[in-house]
Amino acid sequence: MFHEKPDKLLLSSIESFEIEPDLLTLRRIEEVINKTNQYRSNTIENYETKLNTMKSEFQSLMSEINLLTKVSGINYENLKLLGNGNEESMGDLSNKNIFNVMNEKSIELDNLKLSLAKNLNDLESQINSMNITKKDLMEKYELVKMKNDNLINDNILKNPDSKAIKINIYKNLGVEIESGEEGETENKQDKVIIYNKETNLSSILNIDDKYSEYFITNYIWDRLQGY
């Protein structure tokens, strides 16, 4: 055996090996690898298809949401009534999300409430101040009126004639008598100033010696009754 040629010896050794089982195992491994690669490719393809479908559905849903949340039509008109509502503050809302705009309007309304509350407090303070001033003026008016009435009453008591009584009646009806001695002009005539509350008109009569008491009385009564 050892005297045989090396090539024959090698060939004989190779032929003695059983390689078929190993080859079969290798083929099976290759088949498994191929099947695994095919399964992997199919799985990736399926996932890519599903992903593209989901992307398309997502874009479609986003378009619908944007359309539903878009500020337009009646929404725009209603939002104009909230907050400031001027064109500058509204701007171009056609591309804005309605919920974002509503949040902005909510902030505007809160600011407006604060501003109105401040203005209301200021008005109440002014009204209180004016009421105090009015009360003070009314007290002064009543005091002056009381003094004037006292002077007239004292004059009537001291001069109980018909002229003083008439003057008192006229004053109560809105007639003022201005003495000529109080004027600064050369004309020293007395004046009767008649104010008609209903017509809101005033008349002035310069008392002249040529006018009788009857004429003056009728003139005053006519003016008080609106002519």
From Swiss-Prot:
Domain of life: Eukaryota
An example Gene Ontology biological process: sister chromatid biorientation
Annotated signal peptide: none
Key words, A-Z: Cell cycle, Cell division, Centromere, Chromosome, Coiled coil, Kinetochore, Mitosis, Nucleus
Primary localization: nucleus
Cited InterPro entries: Ndc80_Spc24, Spc24_Fungi_globular_sf
Subcellular location(s) of the protein: Nucleus; Chromosome, Centromere, Kinetochore
Coiled coil: 41-70, 107-155
Disulfide bonds: none
An annotated GO cellular component: Ndc80 complex
The keyword Nucleus is assigned to this record: yes
GO MF terms, alphabetically ordered: microtubule binding
Keyword Cell cycle: yes
Subunit and interaction comment: Component of the NDC80 complex, which consists of NDC80, NUF2, SPC24 and SPC25.
The protein's role, per its UniProt record: Acts as a component of the essential kinetochore-associated NDC80 complex, which is required for chromosome segregation and spindle checkpoint activity.
UniProt similarity note: Belongs to the SPC24 family.
PANTHER family: KINETOCHORE PROTEIN SPC24 (PTHR22142:SF2), PTHR22142
Protein name, per record: Probable kinetochore protein SPC24
Species of provenance: Debaryomyces hansenii (strain ATCC 36239 / CBS 767 / BCRC 21394 / JCM 1990 / NBRC 0083 / IGC 2968) (Yeast)
Gene that this sequence comes from: SPC24
